[in-house]
A protein has these predicted regions:
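Short, Lys/Arg-enriched anionic-surface-contact patches
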Residues: 1-8
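C-terminal peripheral helix-coil segments that are non-catalytic and often amphipathic
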Residues: 123, 127, 156, 160-204
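Helix-turn-helix
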Residues: 11, 15, 19-53
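Alpha-helical structural segments
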Residues: 11-18, 53-75, 82, 86-89, ...
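Helical hydrophobic small-molecule/effector-binding pocket
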Residues: 80-103, 109-114, 144-147, 151
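Amphipathic alpha-helical packing segments from all-alpha helical-bundle domains
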Residues: 105-130, 137-145, 168-179
Length: 204
């Protein structure tokens, strides 16, 4: 007869996430989870089969949490700037969870997180900025580099910028990319003469 399980899967996942928040994914083991719950490791493997399965469910839960937090930023007047600020705020408030999603993930699950976020944001970008889907995806991928770079600096405690400066940096990049999409033919397809445009811009 199988032993009675004292904790539900959800409670084990919640406890696992708390361990990650406190000391990182590298310290989430069957033994550390069992110790926190004051149980043996057997109920954990009864519920999940393996730590790989357990960690996969934790990753999925954290991804959902990330999307919930960042999607709220789309309610701002400028959707991607609101999203970007929420993205950075998530990194600031939950650095270990951010590491789990985007830095320490060896299976490149962050690519799925990026794609899911892109799918969520695309309609808002098209509606607010009056651009087609391809241009919206181009805008997103370029702005993601900026936002992810800032968030990574914050998580690694290397960010030299104030919140005001971060907002100004994001606005500057956003305006530049959006303007280029709208005014430079072939920009989205990388089918334009950048060298000639630069010479014209600097007055040569």
């Amino acid at each position: 007869m199988a032993p009675k399980i004292k904790y539900t899967r959800e409670e084990m996942i919640e406890t696992g996430i708390n361990i990650i928040k406190e000391s990182g994914i590298e310290n989430l083991t069957a033994r550390s989870l069992a110790k926190r719950l004051s149980i043996s490791t057997q109920p954990i493997f009864t519920c999940f089969g393996s730590m790989e399965e357990f960690q996969a469910e934790i990753y999925e839960y954290v991804e959902i949490l990330f999307h919930e937090k960042t999607q709220a930023g789309l309610k701002a007047n400028t959707p991607f700037l609101g999203y970007g600020k929420a993205y950075i705020q998530f990194a600031r408030e939950e650095p270990e969870l951010y590491r789990l999603l985007f830095i320490d993930n060896k299976k490149q699950g962050y690519l799925k997180v990026m794609k899911d976020a892109q799918d969520l944001i695309r309609p808002s970008l098209q509606k607010i900025y009056h651009i087609d889907a391809k241009s919206a995806d181009f805008y997103y991928s370029n702005m993601w580099l900026v936002v992810h770079g800032i968030a990574s600096l914050i998580v690694t405690e290397c960010c030299p910028y104030t919140d005001k400066q971060i907002g100004e940096i994001m606005m500057g990049f956003s305006l530049s990319i959006c303007q280029s999409i709208k005014t430079i033919p072939g920009f989205v397809d990388n089918n334009y003469d950048g060298y000639t445009l630069y010479k014209k811009m600097i007055g040569e």
